[in-house]
């Protein structure tokens, strides 16, 4: 419950109100793919191609990849 994902944890159990994470075990609840992240929505990975970070300046938007909760940087990141 320290807001860090540590070895053996699938999710951080620091937020008992998180519906995706079992606060007692720090494991994802049955059926959950993720508990947090820019590409996690209602315990599921957002579909590939969903914008997760809007471009700033000369950069380009970043998109979810459909297989993780993180928001990968585009290959042209400035």
UniProtKB/Swiss-Prot annotation:
GO function terms (MF aspect): toxin activity
Major localization class: secreted
Any one Pfam family match given in the protein's UniProt record, by short name: Disintegrin
InterPro entries linked to this entry: Disintegrin_CS, Disintegrin_dom, Disintegrin_dom_sf
Coiled-coil annotated residue ranges, if any: none
Disulfide bonds: 11-26, 13-21, 20-43, 34-40, 39-64, 52-71
Residues under site feature: May bind to both beta-3 (ITGB3) and alpha-V (ITGAV) integrin subunits: 77
Site (May bind to metal ioncoordinated at the beta-3 integrin (ITGB3) subunit): 58
Keywords attached to this entry: Cell adhesion impairing toxin, Disulfide bond, Hemostasis impairing toxin, Platelet aggregation inhibiting toxin, Secreted, Toxin
Site (May bind to alpha-V integrin (ITGAV) subunit): 53, 56, 73
Any one of the GO CC terms: extracellular region
Motif Cell attachment site: chain residues: 56-58
Stretches assigned to the Disintegrin domain: 1-78
Tissue expression summary: Expressed by the venom gland.
Site residues (May bind to beta-3 integrin (ITGB3) subunit), renumbered to this chain: 76
The organism's place on the tree of life at top rank: Eukaryota
Compartments, as annotated in UniProt: Secreted
Keyword presence, Secreted: yes
Subunit (UniProt): Monomer.
UniProt function note: This recombinant disintegrin antagonizes integrins alpha-IIb/beta-3 (ITGA2B/ITGB3) and alpha-V/beta-3 (ITGAV/ITGB3). On ITGA2B/ITGB3, it interferes with the outside/-in phosphorylation of the focal adhesion kinase (PTK2 / FAK) downstream of the integrin. It strongly inhibits platelet aggregation induced by ADP, thrombin, and collagen, abolishes and reverses dynamic platelet recruitment to immobilized fibrinogen. In vivo, it induces a dramatic increase in the tail bleeding time, and has a strong antithrombotic activity.
Miscellaneous remark of the record: Is derived from the P-II subfamily of the venom metalloproteinase (M12B) family.
Name of the molecule in the record: Disintegrin DisBa-01
Lineage of the species this protein comes from: Eukaryota, Metazoa, Chordata, Craniata, Vertebrata
């Amino acid at each position: 419950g320290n807001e860090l994902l540590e070895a053996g944890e699938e999710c951080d159990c620091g937020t008992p109100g998180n519906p995706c994470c079992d606060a007692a075990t720090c494991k994802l609840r049955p059926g959950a793919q993720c508990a947090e992240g820019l590409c996690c929505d209602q315990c599921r990975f957002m579909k590939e191609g969903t914008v997760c970070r809007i471009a700033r300046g000369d950069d380009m938007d970043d998109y979810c990849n459909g297989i993780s909760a993180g928001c990968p940087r585009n290959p042209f990141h400035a």
